[in-house]
UniProtKB/Swiss-Prot annotation:
UniProt catalytic activity: apo-[ACP] + CoA = holo-[ACP] + adenosine 3',5'-bisphosphate + H(+)
Gene encoding the protein: acpS
Name of the featured protein: Holo-[acyl-carrier-protein] synthase
EC assignment: 2.7.8.7
GO cellular component terms listed in the entry, alphabetical order: cytoplasm
Family label: Belongs to the P-Pant transferase superfamily. AcpS family.
Subcellular location: Cytoplasm
Origin: domain of life: Bacteria
Presence of keyword Repeat: no
One Pfam family named in its UniProt record: ACPS
Major subcellular site: cytoplasm
Annotated transmembrane regions: none
Functional description taken from the UniProt entry: Transfers the 4'-phosphopantetheine moiety from coenzyme A to a Ser of acyl-carrier-protein.
Protein backbone atom coordinates (compact mmCIF):
# COMPACT_ATOMS: atom_id res chain seq x y z
CA UNK A 1 0.00 0.00 0.00
CA UNK A 2 1.21 3.53 -0.73
CA UNK A 3 1.92 5.60 2.39
CA UNK A 4 3.01 8.75 0.59
CA UNK A 5 4.00 10.29 -2.73
CA UNK A 6 6.16 13.35 -3.31
CA UNK A 7 7.80 15.09 -6.24
CA UNK A 8 10.04 18.11 -6.69
CA UNK A 9 11.88 19.97 -9.43
CA UNK A 10 14.93 22.19 -8.82
CA UNK A 11 16.67 24.66 -11.11
CA UNK A 12 20.37 23.74 -11.06
CA UNK A 13 21.34 27.42 -11.35
CA UNK A 14 19.65 28.07 -7.98
CA UNK A 15 21.98 25.61 -6.26
CA UNK A 16 24.91 26.88 -8.31
CA UNK A 17 24.35 30.39 -6.94
CA UNK A 18 24.04 29.13 -3.38
CA UNK A 19 27.25 27.14 -3.78
CA UNK A 20 29.08 30.17 -5.19
CA UNK A 21 27.78 32.38 -2.38
CA UNK A 22 28.28 30.04 0.57
CA UNK A 23 30.78 27.44 -0.63
CA UNK A 24 30.90 24.04 1.00
CA UNK A 25 29.05 25.38 4.06
CA UNK A 26 25.90 25.24 1.94
CA UNK A 27 26.51 21.59 1.07
CA UNK A 28 27.18 20.80 4.74
CA UNK A 29 23.75 22.19 5.65
CA UNK A 30 21.83 19.95 3.26
CA UNK A 31 23.87 16.75 2.88
CA UNK A 32 24.15 13.79 5.23
CA UNK A 33 27.78 12.87 6.09
CA UNK A 34 28.14 10.14 3.45
CA UNK A 35 26.53 12.38 0.82
CA UNK A 36 29.02 15.11 1.68
CA UNK A 37 31.90 12.70 1.05
CA UNK A 38 30.36 11.73 -2.31
CA UNK A 39 29.90 15.41 -3.14
CA UNK A 40 33.58 16.12 -2.49
CA UNK A 41 34.79 13.04 -4.37
CA UNK A 42 32.56 13.80 -7.36
CA UNK A 43 33.86 17.29 -8.02
CA UNK A 44 31.46 19.28 -5.80
CA UNK A 45 28.96 20.12 -8.54
CA UNK A 46 25.74 22.10 -8.35
CA UNK A 47 24.02 19.32 -10.35
CA UNK A 48 24.83 16.84 -7.55
CA UNK A 49 23.34 19.21 -4.99
CA UNK A 50 20.26 19.83 -7.15
CA UNK A 51 19.53 16.10 -7.43
CA UNK A 52 19.92 15.62 -3.68
CA UNK A 53 17.86 18.70 -2.84
CA UNK A 54 15.02 17.60 -5.15
CA UNK A 55 15.09 14.10 -3.64
CA UNK A 56 14.94 15.43 -0.09
CA UNK A 57 12.09 17.83 -0.91
CA UNK A 58 10.14 15.02 -2.58
CA UNK A 59 10.77 12.71 0.37
CA UNK A 60 9.65 15.30 2.91
CA UNK A 61 6.42 15.73 0.93
CA UNK A 62 5.90 11.96 0.80
CA UNK A 63 6.36 11.81 4.58
CA UNK A 64 3.63 14.44 4.87
CA UNK A 65 5.76 16.75 7.00
CA UNK A 66 7.75 18.91 4.64
CA UNK A 67 10.63 20.29 6.65
CA UNK A 68 8.73 20.61 9.91
CA UNK A 69 8.11 18.42 12.95
CA UNK A 70 11.88 18.14 13.36
CA UNK A 71 12.54 16.71 9.87
CA UNK A 72 15.68 18.27 8.38
CA UNK A 73 17.47 17.98 5.06
CA UNK A 74 20.24 15.97 6.72
CA UNK A 75 17.68 13.45 8.05
CA UNK A 76 17.05 12.32 4.46
CA UNK A 77 19.92 10.54 2.71
CA UNK A 78 20.13 9.43 -0.91
CA UNK A 79 21.98 6.13 -1.31
CA UNK A 80 22.66 3.93 -4.35
CA UNK A 81 22.73 0.15 -4.69
CA UNK A 82 25.47 -1.71 -6.59
CA UNK A 83 23.67 -1.08 -9.90
CA UNK A 84 23.47 2.65 -9.17
CA UNK A 85 19.73 2.71 -8.45
CA UNK A 86 18.93 5.43 -5.91
CA UNK A 87 16.86 4.97 -2.78
CA UNK A 88 16.37 6.79 0.50
CA UNK A 89 17.65 6.24 4.00
CA UNK A 90 15.87 8.00 6.86
CA UNK A 91 17.50 9.34 10.03
CA UNK A 92 16.28 11.24 13.10
CA UNK A 93 12.77 12.68 12.93
CA UNK A 94 12.36 11.46 9.33
CA UNK A 95 13.03 7.88 10.47
CA UNK A 96 10.52 8.28 13.30
CA UNK A 97 7.88 9.51 10.85
CA UNK A 98 8.63 6.67 8.41
CA UNK A 99 8.19 4.13 11.22
CA UNK A 100 4.93 5.78 12.30
CA UNK A 101 3.65 5.47 8.71
CA UNK A 102 4.78 1.83 8.52
CA UNK A 103 7.12 2.48 5.60
CA UNK A 104 8.88 -0.66 4.40
CA UNK A 105 10.28 0.74 1.14
CA UNK A 106 11.17 4.18 -0.18
CA UNK A 107 11.30 4.18 -3.98
CA UNK A 108 13.16 7.12 -5.51
CA UNK A 109 13.48 8.17 -9.14
CA UNK A 110 15.93 10.94 -10.08
CA UNK A 111 16.38 12.66 -13.41
CA UNK A 112 18.31 15.71 -14.49
CA UNK A 113 19.20 17.77 -17.49
CA UNK A 114 21.50 20.74 -17.72
CA UNK A 115 18.98 23.15 -16.19
CA UNK A 116 16.78 21.03 -13.90
CA UNK A 117 16.79 18.10 -11.50
CA UNK A 118 13.59 16.18 -10.77
CA UNK A 119 12.80 13.64 -8.05
CA UNK A 120 9.81 11.40 -7.44
CA UNK A 121 9.33 9.42 -4.21
CA UNK A 122 6.84 6.69 -3.33
CA UNK A 123 6.71 5.39 0.24
CA UNK A 124 5.31 1.86 0.51
CA UNK A 125 3.97 0.01 3.56
CA UNK A 126 3.77 -3.71 4.26
Amino acid sequence: MIAGIGTDIVAVVRLERALERHGERFAQRILAPTELLNFREGGATAAFLARRFAAKEAASKALGTGFSDGVTLRDLEVVHDVRGQPSLRFHGAAAERAVALGVSEAALSLSDEREYAVAFVILVTG
